Amino acid sequence: MAFDRQKLVEAVKEAKARAKPRNFTQTVEMAVNLKDVDLRKPENRFKLEVVLPHGRGKEPKIAVIADGAVAEAAKKLGLDVISGEELEELAKSPRQARKLAKKYDFFIAAAPLMPKIGRYLGRYLGPRNKMPVVVPPTMTNLEPIVEKLKKTVRIQLKNNPVVHAPIGTEDMDDEKLAENAEAVLNAIINKLERGENQVKSVYIKTTMGPAVKVER
């Protein structure tokens, strides 16, 4: 790979050093700028789920849209549950639906409710790349899915030749953040026709901090 792990570590270190202290733990983000990608062609756009080897650094907000067994399984794990009835209510309140789409990082949904989710929430979840992980209505153990989501980031290449991804939080070890960055980079490169030759540049920054270029 064209990006040396040590160069990623150095960029992470510098991005953290240049970030002013804030009264919250900042996310560390990566931007991958691409070249020679014709985004007018749908086959060149993509959505990806990447499991970060060292996790996201903070717990993602997960909601479960379900009734019955799946709802009970979600409650056992302390997850927020949206029932089929509440889903119907959201159809009458676009403002609440928008708010819901913004509030959670991931959704898990029981399969029978997917047609309604598509109808009532699709327009808010789709553009945010937050369509639910679908599970059968009889599932009684959501723990494996939840544990995986805790380490997962969703990324997409849509209208602009740049891919943004959170790779952890500023209180994480530099090496671990670099390994997370590497996992995301490799996933993106694997989707490109000419691989790393189509990566123009990579930047790392904290939420409020300046962007630091990763040297090659």
UniProtKB/Swiss-Prot annotation:
Q: Which GO terms describe its cellular component?
A: large ribosomal subunit
Q: Superkingdom of this entry's organism?
A: Archaea
Keyword RNA-binding among UniProt keywords = yes
Q: List the disulfide bonds in this chain.
A: none
Print the keywords alphabetically: Repressor, Ribonucleoprotein, Ribosomal protein, RNA-binding, rRNA-binding, Translation regulation, tRNA-binding
Gene Ontology process terms (BP): regulation of translation; translation
Q: Which family does it belong to?
A: Belongs to the universal ribosomal protein uL1 family.
The role this protein plays is: Binds directly to 23S rRNA. Probably involved in E site tRNA release.
Question: Entry's HAMAP family?
Answer: Ribosomal_uL1_A
Q: How does it assemble?
A: Part of the 50S ribosomal subunit.
Q: What name goes with this protein?
A: Large ribosomal subunit protein uL1
